[in-house]
């Protein structure tokens, strides 16, 4: 039996601060892209263009995904050379740069078959062994470098997209029956901000991201599936695409553009 589903796309306007910041990012991106085109070097700067597109996706979620990338407290953790987020399922190239496993796959697949792919950091031909195990990271260091620990959260301002999510989840909660929801994002930092906001709005949440061990991931899934009080499961797109059968959830939210 095939059950019907509904896809709803919300369109909302930024507040003034978000709009000004996103406009500046878009203007800078357009200027750089036009420069590459006018000089005839667009294909030689594919990695830079990939990064510019990534920035535009991040600013649509929350300005802090860009503003707080390199703030104090963000050291000693592996950072992806493509998305500039803490690396999920971290792997290392032959030129000794770190990547999220999924980011590296997507990046290399974006090139035509047989073409030479340059490293986005050092611009030499990129070679990665995708069979290598994840680079081990200290769990406490990863937690310490969370974006939540790099922001004065008492002064923090939410974003239009996060507030839309909170509003939609509140509407589900107002019904008599319990609804479980999954929130997907490519950016771990976005999920951390969403988690912080939802918990302060009274929602019980659980998270699954690429920094977790297989046992930790399974425990998170079990907790979401079997605890009636947990309403929201925050899942990284880079970590949650394998062997997930979350039939308990009746709503899915994708927050990335």
PLM region descriptions:
Residues 11-12:
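Interdomain hinge/linker elements that couple catalytic modules in large macromolecular machines
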Residues 1-6, 15-19, 23-257:
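ASCE P-loop NTPase motor core, strongest for the SF2 helicase catalytic module
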